[in-house]
Amino acid sequence: MEKLVLEPVTRIEGHAKITVQLDEEGNVKDTRFHVMEFRGFEKFLQGRRIEEAPRIVPRICGICQVQHHLASAKAVDACFGFEPEDIPETAYKMREIMNWASYVHSHGLHFYFLAAPDFIGGKDRETRNIFKIIQDSPDVAKQAIELRKNAQDIVAATGGRAIHPVSFIPGGITTELDKETQEKLLKKAKRNVEIAESTLELAIPIFEDNMDLVESLGTIETYHMGLVKNGTWDVYDGVVRVKDKNGENFAEFGPDEYTKYIAEHVKPYSWLKFPYLKELGYPDGVYRVSPLSRLNVADKMPDAAPKAQEYFKEFRNKFGYAQQPLLYHWARLIEMLAAAECMASVLEEDLSGKKIHGKLERQEGEGVGIVEAPRGTLIHHYACDKNGIITKANLIVATVQNNPAMEMGIQKVAKERIKPGVDVDDKIYNLMEMVIRAYDPCLSCATHTVDGKVKLFTLEVLDSEGNVVKRL
């Protein structure tokens, strides 16, 4: 019996590998997605003061830092007895602006730097990278950098700094915007609307040219989950909506109810858990959270995003209730445009209000904060004692919730492509990686080698006793 090992999985945030177990005839017996790093932030939080949590958790990730900051702040809000409507209006809007800016930054990073090389990069692994895109299309590369810089400038202005922001506090925010700064940010937001729309116009024909791959690669049927507010796409507030495999509403629940619906399965070969819908059990209750999931569960895009609404309608008409992982890229770009439009719309409003946080009253209790991170639904759940010391912390991040689906997707690719007598080459490995990349997993703050000069994978052949007999 042989085992094929793909390590590392490239162009993702973090460290992971894929193993494919073959039977005696050379057919695929099992496929696993391994995450080898251990973070332990839930333990780090225990014993700390509850108001410190929003300053600690952005260190979980350098990409979706804003969403950890925000989910934590919402959980701490709840611990202090604040409801979303209790947050001062200016603070609420500022929180949304930073969240949307982070979406533009993250989605832009993923498309241009991590995903696009599979579609518009080189044909072999040495040229399938961002540097090939820079060489062939320098104007596109400059546009990608401008998009991300504009978004990060807005995060810095609203969050106190661009990396690991600090401005969200219990009951509000610490940052104020003067009129001059607001006007500068509005120009950046409007420019990002233009870039986001041009990115869609660039990408859609490319996706359509690869529709055979888009329709088939790693496609599985699962439930989908995401926030909606009165049925509308929302990434900050609302209720969690779950739709079944056929696109019918399965459940809707608020933050405090998530434990009634979500449970977690554990497997010995990965630090990631395998969440599922409690009522259905594992694996029948496997669900996904993602840009595609958010479009699947939403009835429409926000009124502040009319351009994104048009792309959303076209997408829904073309694909209906979509299950294909490679459509995540298309959905991600629709969201990037929506976030840019919403951000520009709010930056045109009056943000001069001086009341930016509420009055705190210490209390013992629990709080749950749910937001939509770029990669999907993010849950922070804290409990604190009468002295405001954290006694329990539970974090359910988007990549964890997508973990079962990612593994199912690569198993489907492996069984379709790896057959007895077939030479397992770089193209097959990259197809499995493409499924993983579609989910944009965020496993840590690091991204693997993308320049093509370092060896991108190691193939180990093991005997039936697990001994390495060949390393390629």
Curated annotation (Swiss-Prot):
It comes from the Archaea. SUPFAM superfamilies: HydB/Nqo4-like. Keywords: Metal-binding, Nickel, Oxidoreductase. Its cofactor is Ni(2+). PANTHER family: COENZYME F420 HYDROGENASE, SUBUNIT ALPHA (PTHR43600), F420-NON-REDUCING HYDROGENASE VHU SUBUNIT A (PTHR43600:SF2). The F420-non-reducing hydrogenase is composed of three subunits; MvhA, MvhD and MvhG. It forms a complex with the heterodisulfide reductase (hdr). This is F420-non-reducing hydrogenase subunit A.
